[in-house]
A protein has these predicted regions:
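A donor-sugar binding/catalytic signature common to diverse glycosyltransferases
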Residues: 145-187
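Conserved small/polar residues in nucleotide/adenosyl-binding loops
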Residues: 191-194
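Short, acidic/turn-prone active-site loops that include or flank metal/cofactor-
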Residues: 18-22, 121-124, 142-144, 180-184
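Hydrophobic/aromatic beta-strand patches that form the interior of the parallel beta-sheet core
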Residues: 14, 53-55, 71, 118, ...
Length: 194
């Protein structure tokens, strides 16, 4: 957006991303801090300044918003995901964008030690696998292992990001979302709406 504002290239561009749904006139925002919501919309608008069209990725169907030039399209699912054959395992598969969330996972594990948990994280000083006990392990991020784990899990738990939630839903996995910030609050509301 800023490149097109400052340098005005002659080549048109199209923005693609789930966040462009926030610009759609019919998108319903959660009842959250109005300043944060305004900043979210402002930042999203800034990334799309002078775009010829915005493709908003979503599982929900919505009519095009001609004023904001937003067209809602299905999510982009990686070929690696579409090639996987899902199975129902006995464990909850998870991803933590911040390894600090491990405390919350361990707290849950203390209350429900019988529930097998396999969470992926990006913790620089951790081993490839950090095994807490028989039913709780943390794994370093590895795309292939992560997707195989998702394909074989019983359910998926993560913050309410976009891509991995879409992949889990594509594979038919139940999803638990724990939003960590305003954009994820919006995603959570979107996923739970009809």
């Amino acid at each position: 957006g800023l490149t097109y504002t400052l340098f005005r290239p002659s080549v048109p561009y199209v923005c693609v991303g789930h966040q462009y749904l926030f610009l759609h006139q019919n998108f319903e925002f959660p009842d959250k801090n109005s300043f944060q919501l305004r900043m979210l919309r402002f930042f999203t608008k800034m990334t799309a300044v002078r775009s010829s069209k915005k493709l908003a990725l979503s599982f929900n169907d919505m009519e095009p918003d001609r004023v904001e030039q937003v067209v809602v399209v299905p999510p982009l699912i990686r070929q690696e995901v579409t090639a996987i054959q899902p199975e129902e395992g006995n464990y909850i598969h998870g991803y933590m964008v911040n390894s600090g969330f491990a405390d919350s996972v361990e707290e849950f594990h203390t209350i429900y030690p019988e529930v097998p948990l396999r969470f992926f994280w990006d913790k620089a000083d951790a081993d490839e696998v950090t095994r807490i006990d028989e039913t709780l392990s943390f794994y370093q991020i590895d795309d292939v292992k992560f997707l195989n784990g998702m394909a074989g899990c019983r359910a998926y738990a993560t913050t309410a990001g976009f891509e991995s939630i879409c992949e889990a839903m594509y594979l038919g996995k139940p999803v638990l979302m724990v939003p960590a910030h305003i954009e994820q609050d919006c995603n959570c509301l979107l996923y739970t709406s009809d």
